[in-house]
Regions:
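Mixed-charge (Asp/Glu-Lys/Arg
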Residues: 1-168
Length: 168
């Protein structure tokens, strides 16, 4: 059963907080070095063709590249199409779309068609499970760590303020 308070916290979090949480989950689950690329605003377009995080690792001499799209909206077919195109264009080994929200029925039904492009989905329930399993943003009692989320939102505000000053 999904931790509803945690799911609610994720759904009301900023994109910046979701990017940082997703990067932390990927790093702790062995995806190697995780880079947050240039998109930090909800309506901003990614200059990297549909993804915001890049994970690079290697197993022996075999390099591995995973691209991740983080959104704060329901996962729709269009988003799967964009990520599949990005996986193919960047020659990535895997693409992951992460959202604290739901997956539309059509996207869920068509997801098997994206296996050739190696596109996976992490929805809100799965993200909550990963965070709880790894002990990220959750208290020992299982409830969300509200102070952690508050600190992440503050970091996001400061980064956005800095980026606005840099753009001037």
């Amino acid at each position: 059963m999904t931790n509803q308070p945690m799911l609610h916290m994720l759904q009301k979090s900023s994109l910046h907080t979701l990017l940082l949480l997703t990067a932390k989950v990927l790093s702790r689950t062995g995806f190697g070095e995780v880079q947050i690329l240039d998109r930090r605003q909800e309506r901003q377009k990614s200059r990297f063709g549909g993804h915001e995080l890049m994970c690079e690792s290697s197993f022996g001499s075999l390099p591995l590249k995973v691209i991740v799209k983080v959104i704060n909206d329901g996962i729709r077919v269009r988003m799967l199409d964009e990520l599949a195109g990005a996986v193919i264009r960047t020659k990535a080994d895997l693409g992951i779309i992460v959202s604290p929200c739901h997956v539309t029925a059509t996207a869920r039904k068509l997801q098997p068609h994206y296996q050739a492009a190696r596109v996976n989905i992490i929805d809100g329930a799965e993200l909550v499970d990963q965070l709880q399993r790894l002990g990220i943003a959750v208290r020992p009692s299982g409830e969300p760590d509200y102070s952690f989320f508050g600190a992440m939102e503050e970091v996001g505000r400061r980064v956005n303020s800095f980026l606005r000053m840099e753009a001037v």
